[in-house]
């Protein structure tokens, strides 16, 4: 690691002036990006005039925009990798030029790029074969292992001794005000400081990589456990929930146990640091004795001062520890207890960073001590050849004294940092033990727990608490300020969310229970997100270790909410079918009552009870009777005065009575009977079956198309892999990777289409179940109205035996047909799942080979970047002790109608799309 840090002394400044001006690869990427930007802008500029359009923009267009962001990130990453490759090649060429012609190259600058890790420092440059063989080329200097010398010292070592001596007597520089000797010392000092920082950076990076790997391992374990829980709940139809008190206790216990484990590891590391520091102290003492043997004189004031400072630090530590114990002896509420745990977690994270810095400092001390001992050894070897009172010997002893002083100062820093680390570890350990003991004694503070009710009340309560608490504790004040800002921001967000929910409720007009559940979940998530954004961003990645149990509880709650939403949607669907049946029955009953009503309404207007006034004799009168079949009859025109005699009028009156009686009998005959009602229901089911078969055949036909596309893409991918094995090289790999990216995008599109197909198939399954329930209801109705007597004539409310048997046969045939359709649909689902699994496997393989991140990893990476908006983190306090949302005034309930459940919210279909249909057949298939 030290060698890799020291190898960064070479410069890439020369390579920064060279750029690729013409590149087909770059042109292709820019053109592709321009097209994607235009398409994305077109999506963004679309207007959502209605709720349906806004829902479509959110659930259809939003994934496309997310996909564009992912593709843009991958393109940027490819450009960065290409630039890194070119920079490495140019750096190698510049290194070769500097080695061949050192007198023509100025001193290089300090290199910050630590990615150039040459595993073999003795390996010659790549392009030395281009130099003529007769050229006198000096050898490349090796990277020093025990000491680090700057590039300027390496160049000066090639010069003649006379030139070096003449340079020592040069005049002071005007710009810096230093002589050449002082400048060389300053350069050497700065290079050593750079080496220390680079070493510390390497240790921090290695620790970060280990923590990052462990974080994703824990993430995968949590996902596997959640999948296991969901599968068991779906299999047995049960749902287990943990009580709030038990959940808080578990989360607090897990957080404290994680802190204790980390503190124990840090204590072991600190003990090892102490042992290493003792070894280095012995080596420094040995070097001091050897230097005293050369000089016969040494002072120890620094060590005494260090001891006095150490005693002062111990006394201050005891006072801090006592004050800490006094603070913890007070009664803690829920919020105070959560804040104490947060402070402990932040302190443990900072201690981990301090331990890494201490490791790098100890490494630097070891290297400096080795350099000092080598220098003393060289002086002792040359002591016999030099005169004791010569100027050269005095200068070398003076240099040894300076180096020894630097090493002692560095050792003093190591000692101070080690003592400070030990002090903070002891304090953190005692705090963790005290919090563990007070875990069961924490009082439930309901007033503070409901911090989402009223921001003004919370501010007043905070003022009272500030007056009662100790004013010197800045941590409590900071926590209260954060809480006030969080409450204000949360109230604003909740008001905006309430307005959005009211608009959604007005547009949908139903599903109030589902909306309230979704509103509560979204408000809670928003509060957690706001609290996490207000926390400091230092050490957040390491904090995920402690908050992993919180994340699992949040994920469990999220799954439970999804399950409840699916149950509500299923109930609404069942209610829709029941309402449809009731609506059909009511429609038939209303038609019968309508006929009776019109028949009774026309009776007083019969000619026997009185004709209208003779003034209306010139106008033709007509009587219309409304019916669902649109049947009507017309009255003939009345006779004019003086045209007919009294006898003829009486005859026409009698004829009209007979005609009206015939019409009333025909209307009576058109009243639907029970048999006609059952026949109409069966015909309606048959029409629905025809429409369902059309959709089902189209859906099943798509599976074969997906299968053919996947096989073709796999064949093309195998060709590309064989071509890649035949042509080995970086340029060929880049070209083949560009050829494989369209296949990767096509596979991702197929995966998305398969997921949509599975969701649509789940809807078809629900329709089959509803149709089966309809058939069962029709069968029960037929059984109920079947005539038990063997009479030849039955009433309109009964069905003859042979007609009932005929109906039962038709219903049985439709049930068998329904079962066959279900089996075909189940086979299609199994085939689609297998095809989706195969596509997932191929996509994962491509992502590993091409270095492409999927959407989840890209979002995680973007959230981990400092420039991102911040990862939505979960506050420990919220899930330890819970929160209460602001109570809003209830909106006046709208009048519920039978059409309120006809169009469920599209958000439910989107949120419940993760539900996988059961592999077993439903009960109605078994019974049929």
From Swiss-Prot:
Composition bias of kind Low complexity appears in 622-634
Q: InterPro entries, alphabetically?
A: NAB (IPR011684), NET2A-D/KIP1-like_C (IPR056889), NET2A-D/KIP1-like_dom (IPR056888)
What organism does this protein naturally occur in?
Arabidopsis thaliana (Mouse-ear cress)
The record's keywords, sorted A to Z, are:
Coiled coil
Q: Which residues form a coiled coil?
A: 207-309, 360-445, 547-574
Q: What is this protein called?
A: Protein NETWORKED 2B
Q: Where is the composition biased (Basic and acidic residues)?
A: 489-506, 642-651
Extract the ranges annotated as region (Disordered): 108-144, 447-472, 489-529, 620-651
Which domain of life does the UniProt lineage start with? Eukaryota
**Gene Ontology terms for molecular function:** actin binding
Which PANTHER family does the entry link to?
A: PROTEIN NETWORKED 2B (PTHR31631:SF3), PROTEIN NETWORKED 2D (PTHR31631)
Q: What function is annotated for this protein?
A: Plant-specific actin binding protein. May be part of a membrane-cytoskeletal adapter complex.
Protein's gene: NET2B
Composition bias of kind Acidic residues appears in 110-119, 457-468
Q: Which Pfam families match?
A: KIP1, NET2A, NET2A_C
Into which family does the record put it?
Belongs to the NET family.
According to the entry, every stretch annotated as the NAB domain falls at: 10-90
Q: Which GO terms describe its cellular component?
A: membrane
